[in-house]
């Protein structure tokens, strides 16, 4: 029994469902909220699209709640916004609040709900289109003709309080055209359009938009007919010409400023100044300084050469006593029938350079041409009258005119040049002491004694201290005795003059034995040959004062100082005298004669020390 009741119930339900499906009755479809709009931020309206009704009458309702609330509210006004809409008045609208809303559809078969929508009134503002749009063509006398457009803002928006800010946009087109010409007007409610085609009919519309929101709908179109006599002056050409002219002017000004020329200089060029004769501007541009300087008369750069061959290597400084001796010698020879020839003084070295080729040639050639005539190494004396020849005093020349000897007494044979007031004092320069000594020792070949670098074993040179009267007789006997033993190759002896340091004592001869590698000289006293009898050491004639080589200065100048060990040197001299003369001794005596004769002339007194001028050695050895 129970089984029969259950099966009957199932059958009834299946029959009911079949009947409903055959009649088309279903639950409603899902609705959709598609738009919410606020015209003035005070009220807003939302619209939705309903779904299928299922063949049955369907009711729609909108429910919402504000963010942060749980209480649900239903739409306050379904009529103001039209069908399927909900309008929120001022009392239901709140700024800066978010609304969460949805739509519910219900019929006999069931119900359905839309998706939730979040709405902020600030961002859903869309004003109404502008009102009272007016269009007019104006042709002022002093201006170009134009199309004047004017409109009014929507009435629902309060612009006076500043609650709203609207932006406007205008569009127009000829009636038969397809595209619109859009112009942005900003916040103003008037606008002028200049580019129009005469004789055509235009459509004009306007719309507005708040600062935060959407553009409104376009206002209704307004038509305007442009007259046929409406002449539009096209200013595009004139604007292009003006812009091009401005660019050209800027280029010209830039070029003038870049080159540094002024407008005044271009209009009124300056008067050219006088040109320097011989000055060529092209030489300056090409950079040839040598030709430019020669054109201006300036000296060019000095030529490069070996300055070691041109410059004087050493200098000799004469003090005032030398000038006094020169004046004395010139007074002693007032009229000898001889005219001295002076060399041009060298302003750089202080005395005429001994390296002058002309001076050396004159020194070497003149003694060979006339052996009986004495020529000074620095001054060449020539007779004014060729028939009248100058001869030296008989006391000064001996040994048949081969070896002239000059003593300090009596008539002096001066070799000093006469002073010239308009020139510098003629001076001689030092030569390298090594070259001088090689010239002296090379041909002689005499045995030498080596000097060490420290100067400890410096050899001595002797000086015989005699009176002026005894010196004359002794020198005469020495010349006569020396003439008997020497051959034709005996070199000349230079005159024994008064030394610059004022010593009236004649000096004895010294002998050059050897030259060290450092340029040091080995000196020995010369053997007396005037008599074969040795003299006692106690006699006045044998009282000799020796000098030793103290050292060589930076300028290769020998420094001679008096030797306190006179006894040792005297013994050395006596042993030298006892040695028999030989060929080597004879050759050494030749070199000694040249060295001794020039030593008295070439010495200078400086601070109590005696100097030897090697320049004089060269002249005597030649």
From Swiss-Prot:
InterPro entries (alphabetical): FN3_dom, FN3_sf, Growth/epo_recpt_lig-bind, Ig-like_fold, Long_hematopoietin_rcpt_CS, Type-I_Cytokine_Rcpt
Membrane spanning stretches: 235-258
The organism of origin for this protein: Homo sapiens (Human)
Residues carrying a glycan: 59, 104, 233
Impact upon substituting residue 170 to L: In MFAB; confers constitutive activity
Main location (coarse class): membrane
Disease per UniProt entry: Multiple fibroadenomas of the breast: A benign breast disease marked by lobuloalveolar growth with abnormally high proliferation of the epithelium, and characterized by the presence of more than 3 fibroadenomas in one breast. Fibroadenomas are adenomas containing fibrous tissue. Hyperprolactinemia: A disorder characterized by increased levels of prolactin in the blood not associated with gestation or the puerperium. HPRL may result in infertility, hypogonadism, and galactorrhea.
Protein name per the record: Prolactin receptor
Signal peptide per UniProt: 1-24
Subunit relationships: Homodimer upon hormone binding. Interacts with SMARCA1. Interacts with GH1. Interacts with CSH. Interacts with NEK3 and VAV2 and this interaction is prolactin-dependent.
Family affiliation: Belongs to the type I cytokine receptor family. Type 1 subfamily.
Fibronectin type-III domain sequence ranges: 27-128, 129-229
MF (Gene Ontology): cytokine binding; lipid binding; metal ion binding; peptide hormone binding; prolactin receptor activity; protein kinase binding
Location(s), subcellular: Membrane
CDD domains: FN3 (cd00063)
GO biological process, one term: regulation of cell adhesion
UniProt motif (Box 1 motif) ranges: 267-275
Listed Basic and acidic residues bias regions: 466-486
Organism taxonomic ancestry: Eukaryota, Metazoa, Chordata, Craniata, Vertebrata
